[in-house]
């Protein structure tokens, strides 16, 4: 259990993901590895 605690602590302490274009904080999705926010790539809610 100690190792699991260290892993979760590592991910909890990572800085917020920021857009490579404008620098705005990106709302992350578990399946997304993109680094550009929806505003910069002009994506609207579907």
Swiss-Prot record:
Top-level taxon: Bacteria
Official protein name in the record: Uncharacterized protein YhfH
Organism (species): Bacillus subtilis (strain 168)
């Amino acid at each position: 259990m100690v190792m699991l605690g260290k892993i979760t602590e590592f991910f909890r302490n990572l800085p917020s993901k920021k857009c490579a274009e404008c620098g705005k904080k990106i709302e992350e999705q578990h399946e997304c590895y993109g680094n550009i926010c929806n505003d910069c790539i002009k994506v609207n809610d579907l």
